[in-house]
Amino acid sequence: MGYTHYWDQKAEPSYMQWFEIMEHFKHLLLHTSMCIQAESDDPSPFLITNDHIRFNGVGDEGHETFDLSRINVGEFEFCKTAYKPYDKFVVFVLILVHNLAPDCYIITSDGDANDWQKDLDQLNAICETEYTLPETI
């Protein structure tokens, strides 16, 4: 199954924007059942740093590693999740990026608003926010 998310980085998020993205994502991780790690075959912890958010699913529940950079302006990136359980964490990060660093990334997906809505609803409930989906979804 080729279910993929795409992002085209147009600008570098400020340190404050990136900090907010990291903090919201960490909050989500504390309040959801985690199914992510460094790589599908590497049980090391996922990576959340001042420049990257990087993770994959666990074992057979992983597919391609999600790696979002704060500093790769001009790069077109993608992550094929095959709609495996860690996909919701990819969607969480991309929704956060869209709302907290709105002019920095153009986000698209093989999925549509119906595919993303349950993850948006969960994110908004946990973070007590009213974030929106990217217009390109």
Spans of model-derived segments:
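Acidic (Asp/Glu-rich) sequence patches and key acidic residues
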Residues: M1-I137
